[in-house]
């Protein structure tokens, strides 16, 4: 059986670049598949905005994200990448989050380096945890995997607050996670 993580890895291998389209619900996911997209993305803002009419300010829970994820993965075979924000708690909670995402047939997640009471990554005035705490989050996520093909990305929101050098320094610390994502680079050249 090909796991969702393997599907995601294959999509990355086959598509340069892989365009991962946002889908806030099962219907959007089906439309994305019909349009020929190869992978889907559910953002934290997507869950907060589309499911609850709320801003992306750490208001939603693991259960909210897991439920929306299940609805999407039950409607399509496309691999789904999920924004798990800061992981919904400390190390044990992050490990549980990963298990829940795998159980929901999610292919991949990204975990960010903001404080638990986070803001949308595209908004100003973000506060970040230190590099050691984020490295511990990544380790907890990796340790929580029950499927080695499950894809974990580390995301840094440090560009706006620490500049390019700070973002690169953080990425070097987070390299263990397989893939890095900086959400607030000013342009394509910086990212």
Residues of each region from the PLM?
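A generic structural micro-environment signature
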Residues: 14, 18, 53, 94, ...
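Single conserved hydrophobic/aromatic residue that forms the stacking wall/gate
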Residues: 181-191
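N-terminal amphipathic alpha-helix/helix-capping segment at the start of soluble metabolic enzymes
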Residues: 1-22, 31-33, 142
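Alpha/beta enzyme core
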Residues: 5, 26-55, 60-75, 86, ...
């Amino acid at each position: 059986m090909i796991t969702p993580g393997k599907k995601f890895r294959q999509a990355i291998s086959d598509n340069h670049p892989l365009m991962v389209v946002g889908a806030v619900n099962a219907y959007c996911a089906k439309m994305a598949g019909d349009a020929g997209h190869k992978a889907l993305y559910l953002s934290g803002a997507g869950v907060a905005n589309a499911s609850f009419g709320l801003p992306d300010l750490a208001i939603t829970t693991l259960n909210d994200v897991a439920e929306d994820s299940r609805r999407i993965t039950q409607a399509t075979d496309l691999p789904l990448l999920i924004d798990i924000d800061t992981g919904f708690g400390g190390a044990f909670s992050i490990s549980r989050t990963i298990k829940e995402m795998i159980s929901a047939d999610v292919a991949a997640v990204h975990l960010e380096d903001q404080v638990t009471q986070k803001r949308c990554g595209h908004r100003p005035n973000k506060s970040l945890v230190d590099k050691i705490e984020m490295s511990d989050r990544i380790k907890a996520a990796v340790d929580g995997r029950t499927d080695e093909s499950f894809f974990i990305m580390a995301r840094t929101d440090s560009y706006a607050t620490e500049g390019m050098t700070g973002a690169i320094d953080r990425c070097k610390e987070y390299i263990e996670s397989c893939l890095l994502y900086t959400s607030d680079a000013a342009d394509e050249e910086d990212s």
